[in-house]
Amino acid sequence: MQNRSDCRKKPLNIYEIHFGSFRKPSDKADDWYNYEEMIDILIPYLVKNGYNYLEIMPLNEYPCDESWGYQATGFFSPTSRYGTADQLKAFVDVCHKHGIGVLMDFVPVHFAVDSYGLANYDGTSLFEYPNSAVGVSEWGSCNFMHSRGETRSFLQSCANYWISEFHMDGIRMDAISRAIYWQGDPARGVNLNAVEFLQYMNQGLKGMHPSVILAAEDST
């Protein structure tokens, strides 16, 4: 933690990767290097090329390889594709020792429809909209209903978990325009509940972690 990179002292030079695609042991679809193996593969590359931040596409557990982690089922679970939680912690720690901060993509807008995830969690639409007109995203996933206290608490707790437990230096929130505007369409108007959620999220995380980097994707 003491050796983590500090974006306030120098310009950010960010390298973004999908962990399972940077380099593979073989051409097999389900053959990946684990978190610890990537220490000697990825970190020297970042140092050599002068990167001081690594942005990793979602590391939460997800069922479909093709989604690259953007349709999550296990928001509090590092994907086992690349090893254990302790191995991920070791990877982040070595990044910090080399002056490289670690940012993680986080998806607070939608989640996978699989029954073993959040969909219909308690037999009701606890986290998602009951109305399919706004409840289903363009990717066929469930949109989070950001007006609900359960949703806000869950997502902020999840982001705090990754920062606190894995020492992530920042969170990049994905597809935010799909939350701010109904179904991502400015012509349909602003979703004020989603705007309030983002304010709640940012204020809460900054209160707990003043130096954390909070970024968002706006694809309007």
Tell me what each language-model feature is.
Residues 2-12, 18-168, 172-190:
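Substrate-binding/active-site clefts of carbohydrate-active enzymes
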